[in-house]
Amino acid sequence: MITKLQAWSAGAIEMALLLAAAAVPVFVNFYGFHVFDLGKNAVVVSLALAVAVIGLVALIEGAGSGSLLGLTRALRRPLVAAAGLLALTTALATATSITPRLSLLGSQERAQGLVALLAVLALFGAAAWLARDEARRGRIVGMLLAGSVPVALYAVTQALGLEVVPGKVESASRVFGTIANPIFLGAYLMLLWPLALARVWQAVRDDRPVLFAGYAAVALLQLAALLLAGSRGPLFGLVAGLVVLVMAGGLASGRHGVAWGALGLVVAGAIFLALFNVPNSPLAPLRGAPVIGRFGRISETSSGSEAARLRIWRSVGRLLAGRPARLATGHGPEALKYALIPYAETYVAGRGQAGRLVDRSHNVLLDALAMTGILGALALLSVYGAWLWSAAVAAGLAPTAPDRRRLAMLLAAGTGLGASSWLAAPLYAGALTLLGLVAGLIVYFAWALVAGASRPSDAPADSQESSTDATRRLALALLAVGAAAVVEAAFGIQTVVTQVVFWMLAGVVVAVGAGDRIAAAVSDRAPAGVPRQRSRRSREHAAEPEPGGVTITWSAGGAALGMVAGAVLGLIVNDFVLYGTGLLADTLTVVVLLGLAALAAGWLVATDVGESRVAFLIVALIVFGLYVTLRVATWVAAQDASWVYAATVLWLVALVPVGGWWLRGAAAPNAPLGQGAVGILYPLLAIPAGVLVWVLAIQPVRADIYFQSAGANFDAAVKTDDATLFNVAEELFGRATRLNPREDVYYLLWGERYTRVGTAAADVTVAAPAFDKAQKMVAQAETLDPLMPYHTFNRGHLQLLFAQKLEAGSKQSIDAAANAAVALQQVFDKVPYDPQVANELALAKLVAGDSQGAIKLLEYSREQLDARNGQTYRLLGQAYYATDQTDKALEALQKAVAPGTSLAKQERFQVQLMLAEIARERGDLDTAIDHYEQLLAGGAGDWRILFNLGLVYRDKGNFEKSLAALSQTLQAAPDDASVRAQIQQALDSVLAKQGRGAIPGGGGGLP
């Protein structure tokens, strides 16, 4: 007999799935240093732990009703087995990782360790179990779509230039919504668009104009945001998914002409793309057009993102070839940036990446090979292949055993053919292997078209496929999603949000392939609020009022959907209405728009699945009000954003058991509460789960919030010279490091702040303590992460900065520079491809007096690393000038400021100043004057430039301009007696020249 606890478990797990579907994409933590994936993953892990604990309860409660037998049968399904294989290979890679802790917990930037994978696999298992029930499946897919609405709408507001929160953005030209990056936003929406189309088509079939209008609006909004993101990988994936959808739909419905047309479009599209990339083709003018123009630059592999991606792929290829012993298990999840360092090339893993070292190869298969080895890569391919096979079978495209074998063989053959490119074109093999998998699917469709076989509309009675038209249409959409995901994986990166969507939909694929349950495995009847044994269409109309009257209905399912919508409304407020930060002009407008859109999307889903819209709306507003009250109370009590975050996550977890009550399956009236004495142990399961939520999800993000707040206070203290703010910053930094003591980046960035303080100090005695503090911070970062050579680089860098603060040529300065050179040489030995490290080492040699060593190193950097690096030419000019090689110095300095080189404004000033000095020494006074005047016009306010300009005008005989420049110098010069005496001497010499002709006068110029 089904116990009441077992029935509740199913509802609670569904509630966790609905929250993950709708809340994770919209959640943003602007309080933290890592705004996006760290906080999102914390929510996923928290909900997944709830799923795991409640699932264990359900398994124990159902031990006597065949649950274990059902679990055994589920493991035999291809996609479930592939997911299990992926978990095992990832666990093995983590156990043998070069960075075990990082591989287990994930990085702060990506949050994609073993824990994150197990979390999304828990959601996968839950979806596979529950989505066999049509009502539950409808709610899960519906909330995935509803969750995309505020995300896509926020992206549109970004395109309109509406500012909601202050701070930096990932992309100023392309939208990114709440998903961190335009590429990631595009991939997320790509996964959902075929499902939106399926709902639109279902509304047409059911003659439901309200649903048609609603889902059409959702699809258009998603498409608009996807196009505004402008990322080619997701667009390629979407096109591939649509081609598969049309071909499969044509086959499934017997409209072979439609399928042939889709195949023809594939050929035409390939021809168009080829012509679009031919230089000087008639299509060339289109390359300047928005969105589509980027597809005309695919062949430009010498610059832009194409060149960067190919550099990464080459580097990963060298890594795989250079460490064959690691091919079995890989280097560990999240370990690519460490493994890649010895095998990278210029501007791949170099310091020039400014702290964002390449940690992904922009190809999911290459990531798997490098991080989880061949076993992990095979597991990944098996997941993709099993998805396509299972969805095609569920859609009725392979109804017989021979068809299924043929489909499996063609999928394997396409993958194998793509993989064979490792022998002929290894640079593109990762992409071609994935594309080959989809090609195998299309070849199967082509075979079916040539064979002329019409797919039967009804599956055999003993098959595992769904027997309803609506379910088959969903299977077709899921097949398109799978194809899109595989194509995008050839060029993209996995993220927290895309992983959540991918694995939840993978669970739906398993459920659809298994067929709808006549009697739910956890229930004697349908879930609460959904009438049993009613058709989808009749259920959809159940909530509509009868003609001539108004009927107010209540359903538990509608209330549960309202809870999810209320949670999303609360998160929108949490995202953009920040304590301690004033509202921008557009904040409230955007928040209201997003809230209304989220509410409308939830209402649409409630209408679609036949739940009460009244219950939905009432509960949504109540839950929203309760959360706002909780948030305000937490802030008033703690005055601490980290506790607001903690309260938010715990609030989401607390909604799970409450929603489970509304979504519970039915038990017999006389059913027991539980299985007896074993139920006493259930509350004990919550203790380790709660500890894990606190340790894995809440504490790291609280630390991140404290660190961000510490940085803001530190910067404000430096700007205002406020000792109180400085003490607050130090106290907050201490909290951050106590909560997350293993995060080396905190120490690194704190050291960089002290380095800036020391560099800006006017006096060495003030600078020395700051540099000493910075040295300690960087040393701690080195201790925590000894595999990262750029911590050593930062140690050498700050030593060099301190050397430059000391008196030039002094023993102390030379010794400090020599120490810096030792550290920088250690780094350069590990990354000889990095121009910035080479330049920094060369500068250390220059300051230490080793000009010839600096020249040799800089010439190597120019000839072997980057022939257009402005820093290299600037330092070469300085080194040549120091060794009296004036002609070479002049040539190098001119190249340093040539078009196409990148130098900071202050560095360009330094180059122009050296060019002016060289021209002056050579007697080319006009050129010297031009350089000095350009410096002054560009904003260089150094009094020494005015002084030297005055002397050049004097030497040229332009005494009026000389007097003007020297008079301004006297006003701008520091209050130093010797300096002012030298300026006055120069003025006297000009006055003497005006009165008596050529009279020897002072003023030799200041360097």
Task: Indicate where each model-derived feature is located.
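Helix-start (N-cap) detector for alpha-helical repeat units in TPR-like alpha-solenoids
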Residues: 233, 703, 744-745, 789-790, ...
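Hydrophobic alpha-helical transmembrane segments in integral membrane proteins
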Residues: 275-289, 574-579, 632-642, 663-720, ...
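Soluble catalytic regions of membrane-associated enzymes that act on cell-envelope
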Residues: 321, 694-883, 894
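Register position in tetratricopeptide repeats
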Residues: 756, 801, 847, 882, ...
